[in-house]
C-alpha cells in the first residue's frame, strides 16, 4: 500500500510538471540498440517475472536525439504493464525504422489477456485501470503519452482480447 501511494504521488508530480511545462528533459544522442540491451539486462536479473522479457533478435544500430531517462520511463512502463497481464508466453521489445518516414517505431508486444475493444481507446487517459485487481495508479500510460508527445512522437496500442497487446510509440529519427 505504501509503495502504491508513493507511486501515485510521483505520478501526480510528473503530470503536474508536464502540464506546467516544467518536466525536465535532458537531450543527448543515444545508441538505441545498446540502450535496449541495457533495459533487457535489468529484466534478466529479476527472478520473479512470470514470463521471459526478450529483445527481438537482429536489431540494427540507430542513434536518436532524446532524453534517455524519459525514454526508459516509457519502455519500462510498457514492459511492467505487460508483466502484470501476461501469465504465459513472452514479452518482446523491438524497434524499426518506419518506411518513408524519419521515425523509429518502438513496441512492446505481449501474449497476455489483451484489452477489450471498448477500452482500447481509453488506455492513455488519466486514472484508467483496465481492471480492479491490478496494482497501479492509472496514470502511467497517460504520463507516457505526454512524454512521447513532448519528444515529437506518437503513441498507441493494438490489442486482441485473449491474444495479447502491442503498445508502441514513434520517435523522430534524423539519421
Could you describe each region identified by the protein language model?
Residues 16-27:
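Helix-loop junction within the histidine kinase core
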Amino acid at each position: 500500500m505504501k509503495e502504491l501511494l508513493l507511486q501515485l504521488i510521483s505520478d501526480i508530480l510528473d503530470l503536474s510538471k508536464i502540464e506546467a511545462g516544467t518536466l525536465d528533459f535532458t537531450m543527448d544522442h543515444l545508441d538505441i540498440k545498446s540502450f535496449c540491451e541495457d533495459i533487457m539486462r535489468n529484466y534478466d536479473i529479476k527472478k520473479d517475472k512470470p514470463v521471459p522479457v526478450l529483445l527481438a533478435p537482429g536489431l540494427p544500430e540507430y542513434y536518436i536525439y532524446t532524453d534517455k531517462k524519459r525514454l526508459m520511463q516509457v519502455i519500462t512502463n510498457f514492459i511492467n504493464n505487460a508483466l502484470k497481464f501476461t501469465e504465459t508466453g513472452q514479452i518482446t521489445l523491438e524497434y524499426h525504422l518506419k518506411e518513408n518516414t524519419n521515425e523509429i517505431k518502438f513496441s512492446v508486444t505481449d501474449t497476455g489477456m489483451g484489452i477489450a475493444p471498448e477500452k482500447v481507446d481509453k488506455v492513455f487517459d488519466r486514472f484508467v485501470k483496465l481492471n480492479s485487481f491490478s496494482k497501479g495508479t492509472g496514470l502511467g500510460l497517460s504520463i507516457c503519452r505526454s512524454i512521447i508527445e513532448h519528444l515529437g512522437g506518437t503513441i498507441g496500442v493494438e490489442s486482441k482480447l485473449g491474444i495479447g497487446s502491442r503498445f508502441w510509440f514513434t520517435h523522430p529519427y534524423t539519421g
